[in-house]
Amino acid sequence: MIYKVLYQKDKIVNPRRETTQTLYMEADNIVQARALVEQNTPYNIELIQELTGNSLKYEQEHADFKLTAFGQTNSED
């Protein structure tokens, strides 16, 4: 499954909507998605959303859609 993860770059600064960033990733479930992000980044996770059907198609066509793979070279910085 593909997940959209909304996050802040670190856990120290108070979250602000204007600084929220997005990454897309594959995982078996939402728990695994959260664990992968927490283990591999210092990010403050705001929301993890499963993308399916029309919402996945929309993101692929209208956003800077690039899957992040942890354990390899990350596609997001």
Curated annotation (Swiss-Prot):
- The catalytic activity of this protein is classed by the Enzyme Commission as 2.7.7.6
Q: Could you tell me the Gene Ontology terms of the biological process aspect for this record?
A: DNA-templated transcription
For whether the record's keyword set contains Transcription, the answer is yes
Q: Which GO terms describe its cellular component?
A: DNA-directed RNA polymerase complex
Q: Which reaction does it catalyse?
A: RNA(n) + a ribonucleoside 5'-triphosphate = RNA(n+1) + diphosphate
Q: Name one GO molecular function term.
A: DNA binding
Keywords noted in UniProt: DNA-directed RNA polymerase, Nucleotidyltransferase, Transcription, Transferase
User: InterPro entries under this entry?
Assistant: RpoY
Quaternary structure and interacting proteins, as annotated: RNAP is composed of a core of 2 alpha, a beta and a beta' subunit. The core is associated with a delta subunit, and at least one of epsilon or omega. When a sigma factor is associated with the core the holoenzyme is formed, which can initiate transcription.
Name the family the entry cites. Answer: Belongs to the RNA polymerase subunit epsilon family.
Function noted in UniProt:
A non-essential component of RNA polymerase (RNAP).
Q: What is this protein called?
A: DNA-directed RNA polymerase subunit epsilon
Q: Which organism is it from?
A: Lactobacillus delbrueckii subsp. bulgaricus (strain ATCC 11842 / DSM 20081 / BCRC 10696 / JCM 1002 / NBRC 13953 / NCIMB 11778 / NCTC 12712 / WDCM 00102 / Lb 14)
Q: What is the lineage of its organism?
A: Bacteria, Bacillati, Bacillota, Bacilli, Lactobacillales
